[in-house]
Amino acid sequence: MSIQENISSLQLRSWVSKSQRDLAKSILIGAPGGPAGYLRRASVAQLTQELGTAFFQQQQLPAAMADTFLEHLCLLDIDSEPVAARSTSIIATIGPASRSVERLKEMIKAGMNIARLNFSHGSHEYHAESIANVREAVESFAGSPLSYRPVAIALDTKGPEIRTGILQGGPESEVELVKGSQVLVTVDPAFRTRGNANTVWVDYPNIVRVVPVGGRIYIDDGLISLVVQKIGPEGLVTQVENGGVLGSRKGVNLPGAQVDLPGLSEQDVRDLRFGVEHGVDIVFASFVRKASDVAAVRAALGPEGHGIKIISKIENHEGVKRFDEILEVSDGIMVARGDLGIEIPAEKVFLAQKMMIGRCNLAGKPVVCATQMLESMITKPRPTRAETSDVANAVLDGADCIMLSGETAKGNFPVEAVKMQHAIAREAEAAVYHRQLFEELRRAAPLSRDPTEVTAIGAVEAAFKCCAAAIIVLTTTGRSAQLLSRYRPRAAVIAVTRSAQAARQVHLCRGVFPLLYREPPEAIWADDVDRRVQFGIESGKLRGFLRVGDLVIVVTGWRPGSGYTNIMRVLSIS
């Protein structure tokens, strides 16, 4: 039977009557034709021969290459293996529960890629010690260059946020605000460290002017809500609408109020200078409302911090409405769902999440999904079913990174939380509808005369067509790796670089596995290229996603330096 005759006979049959193995006939293996422009049918025997032992490519393969989205959903198989190597990066917040060197080593082994320091809490001395601990933990893996794991350090600014003061029992104490009781919200400095169940201090002096009678004050991600009854000389007299346990330094939201805080406070500027001095890789800029807020952060970093990536956190209605202008000047976006879910209706947060992730994917910029992803694991060893679905759906939406906050900063199970996110992400990545995703990204890509971008598109398409197990890219700044990530290859992108900062920062990009190559350059350029490519291959074998007989796509430059990536070749692993 000819291939064309085989196509006709297959089209007459319903997919329901086929085994999943037979449905794998409809996969991407290189010849043009079909609705996507590059699809043809192949026999099961040919499929097996083409794929060989390329385990990395076979997870949820029938679903990934289905003809329609509905068919893709129907073909998802709970018995299919997860992907061999997780593509989505995990950001873990470092706090009292996780800042020891030994605990950090465990978290790195569990899958932490980026360590986040929340500058809403802690002194500069505290964070300097945390940074030193992270670097000590990372360097403990430096014995073998093949198993070394670069970990980026991110500084999360306080931003123009409002917080409560410290309770009179100390920073670790808690009080319960009972529903129906009266609470005075004050800006009197005398209560800054003497808060209690009757009086709550906040660090925003103008709160008495911007919140009217009947207005609401939300505390601790909206868990506690107060309704203003009277505006008095000492502050706002409120009634507890929704009670709860209040700790120190909790976030305060004033939805609908015209908060007149500057985009960057003096404390933020000091924190950013501290970050530059201590060599942080990423800044998470809080409460970004417009493009000029990002420019202010860039100016505060100064020329010494020009290489630091700025990820803008979208946390309010204005930020969502001005998203495009913020995205244009940012290195990436964080969907910060905590404050966002208070500033806009909670039932609309998922719309904002999907919109922002989609626009970031189209623009080729990293996007982080954050807040309450595994919140129950602060106190419990296992997440709720809804939380596991939330993490998986963030991955399916297209997030480059998923973040843990209190789960690792103060939770009882920080290592277990990282392991759980790792496991969920592996399963979700296998279930991505790769055929549709790549075709849409390629179709939406603007025309370009940039050799690096053109090479990246060609490399990803070639990887799909030959079912390559990996794309190995030699990169100086990480840009080539980010361009490859933009088109969401099903294969791993192994980025080999001599730049330690680039190796850490590419963790922001989905599917990129950075390798820091420490050997000095060879006198002959071609020899140096071959050594770095071989280093990438050996690392891929060691990590379990390259096997003998697999095909890999190699992307390199034609000369040393940045901006010369324009060569692609196909190698077979021997």
From Swiss-Prot:
Outcome (variant: V288L): In CNSHA2; Moriguchi
E.C. number: 2.7.1.40
Effect the entry attributes to changing I314T: In CNSHA2; Hong Kong
Binding site for ATP: N118, F119, S120, H121, R163, K250
GO cellular component, one term: pyruvate kinase complex
CDD domains linked to this entry: Pyruvate_Kinase
Keyword Magnesium: yes
GO molecular function annotations of the record: ATP binding; kinase activity; magnesium ion binding; monosaccharide binding; potassium ion binding; pyruvate kinase activity
Taxonomy, superkingdom: Eukaryota
Annotated InterPro entries: Pyr_Knase, Pyrv/PenolPyrv_kinase-like_dom, Pyrv_kinase-like_dom_sf, Pyrv_Knase-like_insert_dom_sf, Pyrv_Knase_AS, Pyrv_Knase_brl, Pyrv_Knase_C, Pyrv_Knase_C_sf
Cofactor(s) this protein cannot do without: Mg(2+); Mn(2+); K(+)
Keywords from the named record: Allosteric enzyme, ATP-binding, Disease variant, Glycolysis, Hereditary hemolytic anemia, Kinase, Magnesium, Manganese, Metal-binding, Nucleotide-binding, Phosphoprotein, Potassium, Pyruvate, Transferase
Record: residues binding K(+): N118, S120, D156, T157
Effect of T384M: In CNSHA2; Tokyo/Beirut; no conformational change
Result of altering R426Q: In CNSHA2; Sapporo
UniProt key word Phosphoprotein: yes
Effect upon mutating R532W: In CNSHA2; Complete loss in the responsiveness to fructose 1,6-bisphosphate, FBP
Residues holding beta-D-fructose 1,6-bisphosphate: T475, T476, T477, G478, R479, S480, W525, R532, R559, P560, G561, S562, G563, Y564
Effect listed in the UniProt record for changing R486W: In CNSHA2; no conformational change
Site (Transition state stabilizer): K313
Binding-site positions, Mn(2+): E315, D339
Additional comment: There are 4 isozymes of pyruvate kinase in mammals: L, R, M1 and M2. L type is major isozyme in the liver, R is found in red cells, M1 is the main form in muscle, heart and brain, and M2 is found in early fetal tissues.
Function noted in UniProt: Pyruvate kinase that catalyzes the conversion of phosphoenolpyruvate to pyruvate with the synthesis of ATP, and which plays a key role in glycolysis.
Disease / disorder: Pyruvate kinase hyperactivity: Autosomal dominant phenotype characterized by increase of red blood cell ATP. Anemia, congenital, non-spherocytic hemolytic, 2: An autosomal recessive disorder characterized by a variable degree of chronic hemolysis and decreased red cell pyruvate kinase activity. Clinical manifestations range from fatal anemia at birth to a fully compensated hemolysis without apparent anemia.
Name listed for the protein in its UniProt record: Pyruvate kinase PKLR
Organism: Homo sapiens
Designated gene of the protein: PKLR
